[in-house]
């Protein structure tokens, strides 16, 4: 998330850990950026557009990867606190709404479902919850083979 220290990667990491702990498969934009740019110390950056330009970071490519995962694999999208300020998270949320996927919002380190119309459902995401879940971290319920 631009404008946040380290592009808010620590919050992405914490959310991914929480959601994996609840049994979800997680597609984290932060983890994907670290894989795509392994020589970059993302956690030392200030989170500016200038840094992305210097790195030749393809925001369009990254968003394409995120949205492709959401469209093809995700059961829902988890939105970090402050997601409304992120162009990418707003796009991911809009795609989730268009596809009738569940959306979950983080409030005080807990996850709650948002209804398709944006209303607060008040249902807390718990381990073993039937539905799956991107500041968008795109999620999918883990299934045993």
Predicted regions, residues:
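Conserved catalytic or regulatory cores that recognize and/or transform ribose-phosphate-containing ligands
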Residues: 1-145
């Amino acid at each position: 998330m631009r404008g946040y220290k380290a592009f808010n990667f620590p919050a992405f990491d914490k959310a991914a850990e929480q959601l994996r702990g609840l049994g979800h498969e997680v597609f984290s934009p932060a983890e994907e950026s670290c894989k795509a740019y392994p020589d970059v110390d993302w956690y030392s950056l200030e989170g500016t557009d200038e840094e992305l330009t210097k790195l030749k970071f393809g925001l369009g490519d990254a968003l394409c990867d995120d949205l492709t995962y959401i469209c093809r694999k995700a059961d829902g999208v988890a939105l970090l606190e402050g997601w409304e300020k992120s162009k990418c998270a707003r796009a991911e949320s809009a795609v989730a709404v268009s596809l009738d996927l569940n959306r979950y919002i983080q409030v005080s380190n807990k996850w709650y479902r948002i209804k398709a119309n944006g209303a607060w459902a008040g249902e807390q995401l718990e381990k073993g919850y039937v539905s799956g879940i991107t500041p968008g971290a795109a999620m999918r319920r883990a299934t045993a083979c």
